Amino acid sequence: MEPERLRRRLGSAFRVRGLLLRAEAVKYLTETLESLNEEEFEDVIDKIIDAVEKQPLSTNMIELSTVEAAVQECSQALDETIKNVFNIIGAFDIPRYIYNPDRKRFVPLSMTNLPVPNLFGTARDKAELFRERYSILQQRTHRHELFTPAAVVIHPDDNRSKFQLKTVETLLGNTAKVREVIVLGMITQLKEGKYFLEDPTGVVQLDLSKAQFHSGLYTESCFVLAEGWYEDEVFHVNAFGFPPTEPSATTRAFYGNINFFGGPSSASVKASAKLKQLEDENEDAMFVFLSDVWLDQAEVLEKLHTMFSGYSSAPPTCFFFCGNFSSAPYGKNQIQSLKGSLKALADIICEYPSIHKSSRFVFVPGPEDPGPGSVLPRPPLAENITQEFRQLVPFSVFTTNPCRVQYCTQEIIIFREDLVNKMCRNCVRFPSSSMDIPNHFVKTILSQGHLTPLPLYVSPVYWAYDYALRVYPVPDMLVIADKYDPFTVTNTDCLCINPGSFPRSGFSFKVFYPSNKTVEDSKLQGL
């Protein structure tokens, strides 16, 4: 590209993002990028600007050193290696991004005045937890076509189908009756038997006597779009709906190639053509998901024998074993018993050399496995329990609950929790169609952008690590390992599966094929 035209394009691209380039920075970029054609330039400049915005900027005037660091980061990102193909990411290793409403961008924690996360959170962490959940849903809702006013209104009726979000504060400031208003807020029960709607600006009492509930599980502490009218300090709700979901591609089109997911790659793996090609070519890749793998039960070990025997001729890429790993609740002998059970599993795996050499094994702890209580995220099983197994089966990973899996360009979240029953028990109003619970459940999780949209006394969370439970941007696959009946549901381009409880569901499990994104139901009953 001609230097003069390149300079103009550079200035324009940075100005669109609200940034200005110093003369020496323009000169450096012109020399670096002059060999690129038009299409390559568009792709590369977006990555460079994304890398610039990740750095702590005190002003919108971009210096040479900032640009040099961004170009260097992009060069490293392009140098993809085999380590980016398959990664298990623990909950405590996920990067934290905070939404900045002024810049309308997500910025890394290092660019904010918030402290580094700590298990023993402060009161500020608890307040920040709900504020961050709210701000993520608010920016997503504002961007939805129903809430985006047309740039040019040709006819007054054009904007009638558009909605405008109000805050609780605007309701409380009115002495007259306010008709037809929509508010985004969190359902809370500040007084027993009375529900309120809360947002960062205030709290208003709700009258739900005439409220219609759209599909989903409306629990306390979940965020809703409430439509109704306000009078005498009470918001009379006509209808409740969830904030609209947003496909991952839409989110990334707006925020660029930020790696929200975690892993070794500096940019999102979604942008990698090399990894996408590897993913398409490797048609034999296969992931096997099992939950409630009770290793202390002889029948379970026998069925695992049968499963390994069946897969020995074509070993899966990875087996994902979710807890609980013991049928008995936590007790004084459980740790010793679990060590022995894992040793028995390792011996079975060693009987099948092809699986032992080729397959990986990932273990996600369950709510009743040994650990520091029921607070999420849960750390992995203790090293002294798993040491012998890891020596016998080197390709094994004991990870957190929840955890994330990055395979080529695909992003998978795995969560072991009996969540369906918990959410049904804590519904403000139970859905009329109880036959369709899996669809209600999946819609709720993806709309909330969070794995546990429940009160903290029902599902406790380490306040400063609440971001590790986010489901935003929407992953390619969400595995909720629950004792509820197995299901497979697709929503917002996300495949959501529950393998069910292995011993309780006739030894059923799920098999996922990443190359064509299909899920197969499998069962060992009667074999």
Curated annotation (Swiss-Prot):
Q: Which GO terms describe its molecular function?
A: DNA binding
Quote the cellular component terms of the Gene Ontology held in the record: epsilon DNA polymerase complex
According to its UniProt entry, the protein's GO biological process terms are: DNA-templated DNA replication; error-prone translesion synthesis
Query: Keywords assigned by UniProt?
Result: DNA replication, DNA-binding, Nucleus
Keyword Chloroplast recorded? no
Decide whether keyword Zinc-finger is in the record: no
The highest taxon in the source lineage is: Eukaryota
Q: Which InterPro entries does the annotation name? A: DNA_pol_a/d/e_bsu, DNA_pol_e_bsu_N, POLE2
Q: Where in the cell is it found?
A: Nucleus
Q: Give the PANTHER family listed for this entry.
A: DNA POLYMERASE EPSILON SUBUNIT 2, DNA POLYMERASE EPSILON SUBUNIT B
Q: Record's family?
A: Belongs to the DNA polymerase epsilon subunit B family.
Q: Extra notes?
A: In eukaryotes there are five DNA polymerases: alpha, beta, gamma, delta, and epsilon which are responsible for different reactions of DNA synthesis.
Subunit organization = Component of the DNA polymerase epsilon complex consisting of four subunits: the catalytic subunit POLE and the accessory subunits POLE2, POLE3 and POLE4.
Role of this protein? Accessory component of the DNA polymerase epsilon complex. Participates in DNA repair and in chromosomal DNA replication.
Provide the protein name: DNA polymerase epsilon subunit 2
Lineage summary: Eukaryota, Metazoa, Chordata, Craniata, Vertebrata
